[in-house]
Amino acid sequence: MKYINDFEDKNIEFHLKKVDSSFNLQIENETLINYLLSLNMNRESRILNSNEFGEFVSPISFQHGLSGYLFYLSHMRDISENGRIIEWIISEGNQNKGNVYLNGCSILFGSSGYLWVLLEFYKKITSNNPSRELIIDKIRDIYKDLISSYQKVEVFDFALGKSGILLSLMKYCINFNDVDSMEFIREKIEELYLYFVDEIRNVNSLKECNFAHGLAGIAYVILIYNSEFEFKVAYENSIKVFNNLLENLLENEYSRLNATPTNLELSWCEGTSGILLYFELLYDKRYSNIISRFQQLAFKFNLIQSSCYCHGLSSLLQTLNYQDKLNLRENVIEILLSRSKRDKNGILVFECEESSDTLFDFGIGNLGIYWSILGERFPFELKKEL
C-alpha cells in the first residue's frame, strides 16, 4: 500500500488516501467496455451525458461524444461485428441530418474527428460484413462535406481548425488511395505551411506553441505530410526552425514553471505535456533530456492538475507511454487511482473534469484516463503502414 496526497472535490483541503495497488486494470477495462456496450443512444445522439460545454457541441465529438467512445472501443476490443455499434452509427445519421454545431468540422469537436474514427473502424471490418458498405458510405459523405466546408473554417490550429481536418483527410487518402483528395491536401498543406512560417517569425511565448490551439499541432501535421506523402526541403527547414525555437522557449520558461505553473500550463491542450508529446512524435533522441526534465516538473505539481486527458494528469501519463520511465509512470497511475472509486454499476471511475466522476467523454472523462493508464499512444498518430 502507498499513501498519496489527494484533494477532495471542490475544497482545497488535502487528505491521505490509501491506494490499493492490486487493481487488475485489464479486468476493470472489460467491466467498463461491457457497460458502454449495454447503452442505447438517446434522441440527441448521445450515449452518456457530458458537461455543460460538451452538451453544447456536436454529439459525434471526439472530445465529448460518439467518436471518442467508438475510438476507445475499437482499440480495446474487436467490435467490428457488434450490433450495438452499428445501431449507434445508424441512429446518429438519422438524428443529426442538417444540424449545425460550433466547430462542427474540427477534429476534436466535429466531423473530421468522426471521419478519423470511422476510418479506424473500417480497417477492422471484414469484406463480407454487411455493415461495411454502410460505413464506407458514411465515410465518403463526411469526406465530401469536409472538402466543401473547408474554406469556411477560419482557424488553422489542430483542435478546432484546418490542420486537424487535413490530418483526417490524409488518413482518408491513405485508406482509399484517392487522387483528388491528394491534390486537395497538397494545395491546403502549402497554405498551412505559409501560415506556419509567418507565425513562427512572431512567436513571443510558449503558450502560442501549444499542441491543441498553437503551433505544435500545426507543425505535427506538416511533419506528417512531409514524412508520409511528399517531402519538401522547405517544410523540413521550417520544422527545424520551430523545434529550435520551442527548445529555447521551454528553457526560458523552466524557472517560472518550476515555481508557479497553472494546471493548463502543464496540460496537453495548452501546455507542456502537449509540447513534450510533439517532441516524442518526432522520434528523435536529441529531445530526450528536455522531455525528461519537464515530465519531472509536471509530476512535481500533480496536486494542481485534474485527472483528465485533455487538461490534466493523464496528458503527462500519455507522454510517459513513449518513454522508458517505469517508476514515474507507476507513480502517476498511483495518483490517478487515489482519485478513483467504484460507482453504482461496479465500474472503477476517476475524478474527471470539474471534480466529477460521472463523465465518460474521452477528452475530459474516464475514457481518456483509462487510455493513458493502459499504456496507449496518441490517438491521432498517423503513419501509412498503420
What do the predicted segments below correspond to?
Residues Q26-E30, R43-S50, S106, R132, ...:
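Mature, well-folded catalytic/scaffold domains that follow N-terminal targeting or propeptide regions
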Residues M1-Y35, I224, L281, R286, ...:
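Terminal, non-catalytic domain-edge segments
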Residues K10-G65, F71-I86, E190:
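Low-complexity, Ser/Thr/Pro/Gly-enriched N-terminal "stalk/linker" regions
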Residues S238-L266, T272-S273, F279:
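Active-site cradle of extracellular carbohydrate-active enzymes
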Residues F121-N128, Y172-E183, Y225-E236, L282-K285:
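Inter-helical turn/loop segments and adjacent helix faces that build the functional surface
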Residues I27-R46, D78-Y101, L134-V153, F184-N204, ...:
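Long, well-ordered core segments of solenoidal/helical folds
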Residues P59-S74, C105-Y122, D157-K171, K207-I224, ...:
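Well-ordered alpha-helical segments within folded domains of soluble proteins
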